[in-house]
A protein has these predicted regions:
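Non-catalytic positions within long, well-ordered alpha-helices that form the structural scaffold/packing
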Residues: 16-17, 116, 135
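Active-site rim beta-loop-alpha module in soluble metabolic enzymes
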Residues: 72-114
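General beta-strand structural signal in soluble alpha/beta enzymes
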Residues: 23-27, 43, 92-95, 99, ...
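A structural signal for small-residue-enriched, beta-sheet-centric alpha/beta enzyme cores
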Residues: 127-136
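Metabolite-binding pocket within alpha/beta catalytic cores that recognizes anionic/polar moieties
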Residues: 1-70
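Active-site glycine- and acidic-residue-rich loops that bind
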Residues: 71, 105-106, 118-126
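Conserved small/polar residues in nucleotide/adenosyl-binding loops
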Residues: 140-142
């Protein structure tokens, strides 16, 4: 299924319904930085949303809620992931700003340069809205 067709709301809701409290969501990314090589692991601490047509909230009808995403990922879970990766001797990037694009196409060179100039380190197609939807349902997410 292409990333822009994933029903993120249904997936996150289902996880909440079965009692999940914490989500570790690995994803494939492209690097926008030369020091982030294939095989390295980047633990995002920020994201930039460049998607267009995704259902990105549970609060689009009735109740209105404004959820803070200033720090979108759980610091404790991030630290656990960083520690585990270091124990396994992986090349870990402890901070990364990840830009999420709509897909299914990859970015152009011009877009990648723009994202790099914005401070993005990695690029993918599935981080958003998953991380925000999880936060709306009080699920811990990285």
């Amino acid at each position: 299924m292409p990333p822009h067709k994933i029903n993120f709301r249904a997936n996150i809701w289902a996880l909440k319904e079965i009692g999940v409290k914490r989500i570790i969501a690995p994803c494939a990314v492209g690097s926008l930085r030369e020091n982030m090589e294939p095989g390295h692991i980047a633990i995002p601490d920020q994201f930039i949303d460049r998607t267009k047509d995704r259902e990105s909230t549970f609060y689009d009808q009735g109740t209105v809620a404004h959820i803070s995403t200033a720090d979108p990922f759980c610091p404790e879970l991030r630290n656990l992931a960083i520690s585990a990766g270091k124990k396994l001797d992986y090349d870990i990037h402890e901070k990364a700003t990840q830009v999420c694009i709509e897909g299914p196409r990859f970015s152009t060179r011009a877009e990648s340069n723009m994202f790099r100039n914005w401070g993005a380190d990695t690029i993918n197609m599935t981080l958003f809205p998953e991380c925000v939807l999880a936060r709306e349902l009080s699920l811990i997410h990285i």
